[in-house]
Amino acid sequence: MCDMLIESIKSISISESEMKRRFKFTNIEEIHKIEKANKSVMLMCAHYGSWEWIFIIQKHVNHNGYAIYKRIENKYFDRLVRKIRARYNTYLITNKETMSTLRQHKADGIKAIYGFLSDQSPKIESTYHWKEFMNIKVPVHTGAEKLSKELDMGVVFFKTKKVKRGYYETTFKTITLNSSEYDDYQITDMFISYLEELINEAPEYYLWTHKRWKHKDKVPKDFQ
């Protein structure tokens, strides 16, 4: 946890060449395949490892990158987060602007990579799906799946492995190029399953402090 905090802060000052040396992609061609298919990419992300470093992907792909984020009430920390995530020319979209922005991009013919932190806990009143996550049933975000189907995007999960202190390797796993062919919530369930596998391999690199299970006692009867 301490390493992740230090690495997040270091994101502000680390050089591009040093970041490329420390955060490598083993199969960036998975993203290139979707770009060549003339589709946008839905990158389903999680609070695992130094996830803030994923933004260096912009230096390896052709599509522009957009990160979905929730505005932080503390203005200082909000500016800090925006500064970190906007490095390497990544654009930021607040969660409230997401649907309208992505739909407008589709209408304008813009192809992009959209990063969604899909392991966060949604508001209970806007929950559509519950899923066992680390043996506890919780509400799960379905926005990435919904938009990928509506806007015909390729969907990708990425697995980050810590090689040693301050060094990572990321491997992409394409979930689908044709998201509309999947049943409701099937893509979301696949993401959760892949994430569980990743956590089980090295649980110490998951952000356990972000209240992922805060609604565990509110499971509706229909989902029990």
Regions found by a protein language model. Give the residues of each.
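Catalytic core of membrane glycerolipid acyltransferases/transacylases, capturing the structured
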Residues: 37-97, 123-136
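Membrane-anchoring hydrophobic helices of lipid-metabolizing enzymes
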Residues: 1-45, 78-83, 89
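A broad, low-specificity signal marking well-ordered, structured residues that form hydrophobic/aromatic
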Residues: 23, 41, 65, 114, ...
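Non-catalytic C-terminal accessory region of glycerolipid acyltransferases
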Residues: 35, 60, 96-224
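Short N-terminal secondary-structure initiator segments
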Residues: 1-13, 58-75, 103-120, 194
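Short amphipathic alpha-helical segments and helix-helix/interface helices
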Residues: 31-32, 55, 78-82, 103, ...
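Solvent-exposed, flexible loop/coil residues
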Residues: 13-18, 23, 27-29, 52, ...
